[in-house]
């Protein structure tokens, strides 16, 4: 009897086809789990598919569930999913009746607390540091006075305006901006491509190669700044041949690009201050150096002049040099005559004493003989005296000539020394004037470049700038109301006008190109270059 009742109960159950049962299960599951919140670790993530969707799994230590993020949702995520990251996913459960599978369609994704992101960030930092990407030996010094500065940042917002304004105030130079996204999906790839793109520019090409790069972004949360922790961005910064300044977030924010950059700036404005010096300070230093150099040259010239005057005063006069030799010559000449007379007198007296006792013949013969000897001696004495006088006179003349030529040689040496001093002073003056002329020429060239990039050159070709009553430029017809007071600026002046009708936008066609985001107004648009 029990078997009969059991068979009857089973035969009363509703019968389903496989499709009907799968559809019923699908409706039950999707109704019961229409909105769920799941915590798990990302597994099998390989980035978005070519279709733009992202497929991966969420797992814990006991189970795994497939997950998908559709393309539209993926582009709105605040941070990029990564393999091994612990997240909290919010979405709905869907099933596939044809294969008896289910998955979660994620509508929002967030890290499982800041601790999970910080742990992932620290692990990545240690791994890249072990490769040597953060070594201080890789870092390069910034150029003292760059000619071109490359900026990688968003083309809109306050960051680029602050950088351009600060550079213009300190030392106006040419700035090239590479516009990128600084948040969201794909922003990391754009920043890395911009850094590599600047490094790929050739010197002397159509686009000036920067001398220094600034990678900048405003402040934000850890998720907002996560793109600058991407490994691709860090490697691009470390491989950059151009010195790079990191200016991401506020002073308290730290990203991995800060470790790979050559210099970290606390803010984007601080990066602009690091990139260029203050022009007024350079001019003051140059003026001070020129004044010091001029004063040093003047002091050297004065010292040399005083030395020459001291040497001239120390030289004796010609009369003083010849006084002693002349006195000695006069004494020698006067003593020679007196000695000769004394010798002759003594000989004569001796002769007279000897002749008193001789016979006349002997006396005559002896006298004749002595006279002859005396005559010969007198002749030799006269000859000797004349020779000695001539020798003495020759020596005196030679000494006199030497004494006369001595002041001339000293004066010649002094003149040559004076010429050397004057030549050195002229060379120093010429070098100083040449250097100052070069500096003035460089400053004039920069001024001409600034003038050539002024928007007023565009007005000279027939264009005009229309401004409202608050002097703001009007760039859209739809922004002008009927009866509004406007001013039109031409190359030669301004004209006031009143509009007679409301502005209407130009009709768009299907083939119209995509509009570019309007750039913010700048006080001096000529300072900013652009690649696009």
UniProtKB/Swiss-Prot annotation:
One of its GO terms (cellular component) is cytoplasm. GO terms for molecular function: exodeoxyribonuclease VII activity; nucleic acid binding. Residues 497-532 are annotated as: Disordered. It comes from the Bacteria. Keywords: Cytoplasm, Exonuclease, Hydrolase, Nuclease. CDD domains: ExoVII_LU_OBF (cd04489). One of its GO terms (biological process) is DNA catabolic process. Its EC number is 3.1.11.6. InterPro entries: Exonuc_VII_L, Exonuc_VII_lsu_C, OB-fold_nuc-bd_dom. It is found in: Cytoplasm. Residues 499-512 have a biased composition (Low complexity). It catalyses: Exonucleolytic cleavage in either 5'- to 3'- or 3'- to 5'-direction to yield nucleoside 5'-phosphates. Bidirectionally degrades single-stranded DNA into large acid-insoluble oligonucleotides, which are then degraded further into small acid-soluble oligonucleotides. Belongs to the XseA family. Heterooligomer composed of large and small subunits. This is Exodeoxyribonuclease 7 large subunit. It comes from Agrobacterium fabrum (strain C58 / ATCC 33970).
